[in-house]
Amino acid sequence: MSADVAVLALHYQNDVLHADGKIRVGLDADSGARQRLLDNAAALLEGARSHALPIVHVRIAFRPDYADLLPNCDIFRNVARIGAVPEGQWGSAFYDGLQPLADSTREFVVKHTRISAFYGTPLEETLRLLGARRLVVAGVATHSVVEGTVRHAADIGFSVMVAEDACASADPAVHAASLASMRLIAQTAPVADAVRWAAAPN
């Protein structure tokens, strides 16, 4: 096992992934793409656990009255408009099967309220305490929280691998464009290759 790697699992939550969720990023209940994403996300978490890699599960949530939401752009205004990811309710909870292991000392949860999972959170401190220098990042949506977090991670000195098939956007073309853009600052690979990269001695 390489001790300098952590996995970031971003927004694997009911409102984002469940067929009855309020966001869903285009992942309809009968969508083959949706099932592939769920399977790949599960494989990423399983792979990380099999190599005893730390996992930081990042969730987005707001007060039910959205008083803590800064509505400075459409992506946030839309969250409040549709009533998504309210704290303490089903929508903001982790999707069943992709949740943290309750009894694990290698899994952590960080809550955020902006685009980057680092902004205004203890994520960087957590990763430094773990000794992480390399990150495997995956989540939904590719072009928002994933790309925002990857760019922030690169700026503060982490080497990043994006597990591309454990990510998704509502529009596959937007997903592909985001991955292409991130390749300037990160590597991208399918889950199986990303896990091998993480587990390899550095």
Model-derived features: positions:
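Active-site-adjacent betaalpha module
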Residues: 1-6, 47-51, 74-202
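N-terminal nucleotide-binding beta1-loop-alpha1 segment
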Residues: 6-12
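A short acidic, glycine-rich active-site loop
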Residues: 26-39, 79-89
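A short, N-terminal amphipathic alpha-helix
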Residues: 35-54
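Short, electropositive alpha-helical surface patch
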Residues: 61-80
